[in-house]
Amino acid sequence: MASSFNSLAPQIDLPQTEHQILSFWETQDIFQKSVAAREGKPTWTFYEGPPTANGKPGTHHIEARVFKDVFPRYQTMKGLQVIRKAGWDCHGLPVEIAVEKELGFSGKGDIENYGIAPFNEKCKASVQEHVGEFTNMTRRMGFWVDFDEAYWTMSGEYVESVWWSLKEIWNKGLLVQDYRVAPYCPRCGTGLSDHELSQGYESVVDPSVYVKFPATSGKAGELG
């Protein structure tokens, strides 16, 4: 019986086969066709929880992307139209600290002397560079996601949408003003999220220091 699948050589070159499949997917627009073919079907929407583009991708990013790819593929196989939007987290201390290290800065004062506007531009350029590396890694591992319509947290449109959402919540009386103990970084001169605080955790060994002071009054003072 004839098979529609190509036979594999006994000594298969897996990386070469992967590249052939990836090339076929890209040249034939297989991902886009898988979405278009289910037009009118019930939708299952996936917005990627964006990675922070402050450095080169690591193995933990691959692990997370496996889960982000498996579930949309499963829903696609069930016949749903799966919209998959990529995203890039461009803000936060990780990006700023990476640029500070690149420029040899040691604190907030160096940024102010350098200039807020040019520092922001350096941060944007750094994000753009690392996004390219993330994109290459994502395509190499076969993760299907729409990069053409990706959202960027540093875009004016995205920032305005966040302010709009906050205003809507305020108008509905859902914002509460209260006190909260928040971590603060004296070097960076800014508050920290719980996630950012946990990134700086390390085990250290410090001496225990005991200081004795003479008692000058009370029963302890009477004892000399």
Where are these regions (language model features)?
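N-terminal, positively charged nucleic-acid-binding surface of large information/translation enzymes
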Residues: A2-G224
